[in-house]
Amino acid sequence: MSERRLLNAGGFAACAALLAYALYTQYYGGLEPCPLCIFQRIGIALLGVVFLAAALHHPRGRGRYLYALAIAIVALATLLVAARHVYVQSLPPGTLPSCGAPLSVLLKFTPLWEVVRKVLTGSGECAVVNWRFLGLSMPAWVLLWAFALGAAGVIANLRASSDDPQVMRRFADS
């Protein structure tokens, strides 16, 4: 198995583990996700799908650049949502609007772009920090993981592997 395929499969496994832990804390730990948490879960899930597609497809040549770009875009979007969440959690109490309607209600009665705008502005429920590990909240960990997975995915897919025909031609020409 090539190194790039293995790294993409590892990226998928890391995303799956992050989502599994998020679901564990929700259903067994009693932590209800706020709308920003749900957006971060969607981002990690999409990142996992891109990693899985890159591992299964494993394109040679220029095709790997498309996967590097897709990983970069999804990881950056997830990182930005997590950064917004960390910022919302750092604001002093009383500076955010009160908790609004649940995300399921917003999705049912509000246009999608308005839902995205409302979620990204944050609400009172997004400012609550009820979980920490090594002093960092869950959104801070998502921020770190999105950065690490995005960087690893981009580097792994930009770097030519030994099973790439272009690399083999370069070695044959020298």
Where are these regions (language model features)?
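Interfacial segments of alpha-helical transmembrane regions
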Residues: 2-13, 59-81, 151
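C-terminal TM-helix exit segments that contain a strictly Trp-centered aromatic cap at the helix terminus
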Residues: 17-26, 77-92
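Alpha-helical transmembrane segments of multipass membrane proteins
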Residues: 20-24, 52, 129, 154
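Membrane-interface helix caps and helix-loop-helix hairpins in membrane proteins
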Residues: 28-35, 87, 132
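Non-cytosolic membrane-interface motifs at loop->transmembrane helix junctions
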Residues: 31-41, 67, 97-100
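Structural signal for the C-terminal ends of transmembrane alpha-helices
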Residues: 52-60, 154-160
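Extracytosolic (periplasmic/ER-lumenal) interhelical loops and adjacent juxtamembrane/interface segments
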Residues: 90-137
